[in-house]
Design a protein with these regions (language model features):
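Intrinsically disordered, low-complexity regions enriched in small/polar residues
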Residues: 7, 14, 19-20, 249, ...
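Long, repeat-rich segments with strong aromatic
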Residues: 284-287, 292-299, 303-314, 330-383
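Loop-rich catalytic cores of soluble enzymes, especially ATP-dependent carboxylate-amine ligases
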Residues: 93, 104-335
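Short aromatic/hydrophobic contact patches that present stacked aromatics
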Residues: 61, 145-149, 341
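Terminal catalytic/cofactor-binding subdomain
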Residues: 1-144, 155, 159-162, 176, ...
Length: 489
């Protein structure tokens, strides 16, 4: 979520936000806990909600759920979302800040000084920047996604990843909402997704860029998926010295010496490493915990995410990764539960302009619409696979960049998005189909958030600061209590 100063529209790094959020949680009878890294509060943990940061103090992230799926599941999630969003907006108001309806701040500095001033104190970022050579600062302007997560049986996981990857052009186009950067139009409707080639342009390891790109063929199974992420030609990231599942928050980590792939690392009983905080030599004991911990490595448009109930022995895990036994079966034996993380939809929220133009019914579905699309596709998996086959994997890969650049103005992207929505609608329970409302409205009118933002930007006069302030005033996210009643700006 993109945070801005309420008066100027400039990017805003939160200060008292976490204390404000804690008070709101306590007022509802919850017992929130604040999470700290390097002496700074970075999240508030409460019942079913992690109210934290993405990569910086100007870029908020709230992780919610899980909720029971099936009929009514989207409404159950929406109830949590609207409560959390109301809390976020109220907490920000206490420090003179607002959320902007955009998937990237329209005019935020990304130089090294600005980056260091607001970056979250997550140790992994030091490894990315100082050792792997990533240009992590290109995302410090709050490039924000609305990432739907949908549980999936392990036996269907690879098929589900394939479908969500293939549907990327539709998801990108329908939720495009970042046409500006540095106070200027970029020529892209979803400039947010320019992040990966820029971040990895000077990376030390070629695999980092490769793992952000959709492969040229479908994954055959989960072992195939993980071999691409963890196998020959890849380099594992730092790992915790103690047991941890929090890849951005683990505070004591080590870098394995020699830059091995994870599969090479797991094949040994011990591996030398270097402690990231002290520089001391350590010995690491390879474990299935490392397999679970490093699941973030593919920065794809969709990822399979999971959690073991108990950790399998490494020899059994390696057998499955090498295809000598079924990985899905092994993971099930050790109590793993999995879900698909969609990473294409840009952040979209109701603002006064959308409410006036599309109406309250559409505005009320904006936040949930991406989840509805993904849930519908995965509930209608066979038809979704037929759609992908009809269009062709390579053709859909080629549609991704036109979706980033032109969104629904591209005729083929528009046609594909319409077919995706039809398959998703058929997969949803009749009572849940209205959650597609925003996506349907965008498709029917070819009016993405990016299109509306560009119109606003071109209509504004004044200097750069005045234009930003005017844009921010019109892009301010409405409090859920206003979604049916806000006055037109």
């Amino acid at each position: 979520m993109v945070v801005a100063n309420q008066k100027t529209g400039r990017s805003h790094a939160v200060s008292g936000y976490f204390d404000s959020m804690s008070r709101r949680k306590r007022a509802r009878g919850q017992v929130p806990q604040q999470k700290q890294l390097s002496g700074k509060t970075v999240a508030v943990l409460s019942d079913g909600v992690d109210s934290g940061l993405d990569n910086a103090f100007n870029h908020l992230e709230s992780a919610l759920g899980p909720v029971q799926g099936g009929a009514g599941g989207l409404a159950r999630l929406d109830a949590m979302v609207t409560t959390e969003l109301g809390d976020v907006i109220d907490a920000l108001a206490e420090e003179g800040a607002v959320l902007l309806n955009t998937s990237e701040h329209p005019d935020c500095p990304t130089d090294e000084a600005a980056y260091r001033a607001v970056r979250a104190p997550k140790p992994l970022y030091d490894h990315w920047v100082d050792y792997r050579g990533w240009q992590h600062r290109v995302g410090i302007d709050a490039k924000a996604q609305n990432g739907p997560t949908t549980s999936i049986p392990l036996a269907l996981a690879a098929r589900a990843v394939n479908v969500v990857l293939a549907a990327a052009p539709a998801s990108i186009a329908l939720f495009a909402n970042s046409p500006l950067e540095g106070g200027m139009p970029t020529g892209l409707k979803e400039n947010r997704l320019s992040i990966w080639p820029r971040m990895f342009a000077a990376a030390k390891f070629p695999c980092d860029a490769r793992l952000s790109q959709t492969p040229g063929r479908r994954f055959s199974d989960l072992a195939d998926y993980f071999r691409r992420a963890y196998g020959v030609g890849t380099v594992m990231h730092t790992v915790p010295l103690a047991s941890s599942r929090d890849y951005k928050g683990a505070s004591h980590t080590a870098r394995p010496e020699g830059d091995p792939s994870l599969m090479r690392f797991l094949a040994e009983s011990a591996w030398p490493g270097i402690a990231c905080d002290s520089g001391e030599s350590v010995m690491l004991a390879p474990s299935a915990m490392h397999f679970e911990y490093l699941q973030f490595m593919p920065f794809l448009d969709a990822r399979f995410r999971f959690r073991f109930g108990s950790l399998p022995p490494v020899p059994e895990l390696l057998e499955a990764l090498h295809g000598r036994r079924n990985l899905e079966t092994l993971m099930a034996e050790y109590g793993a539960e999995g879900y698909i993380e969609g990473r294409c939809p840009g952040a979209n929220f109701p603002d006064a302009g959308l409410l006036a133009e599309a109406g309250a019914d559409v505005a009320a579905t904006v936040v949930m619409s991406a989840s509805a699309v993904q849930a519908g596709l995965l509930a209608n998996l066979e038809e979704a696979e037929k759609l992908v086959a009809d269009w062709g994997w390579q053709r859909l890969l080629a549609l991704r960049q036109p979706a980033v650049a032109a969104a629904l103005d591209d005729a083929a992207v528009h046609a594909f998005a319409g077919e995706v929505l039809a398959v998703a609608r058929a997969g949803l329970d009749a009572g849940d189909r209205h959650w597609l409302g925003y996506a349907d409205w965008v498709w029917q009118n070819k009016r993405t958030g990016a299109d509306r933002m560009l119109e606003t930007w071109h209509s504004l006069g004044g200097d750069r600061d005045q234009r930003l302030a005017g844009l921010a005033a019109q892009q301010t996210v409405l409090h859920p209590s206003q979604w049916a009643t806000a006055a037109v700006i």
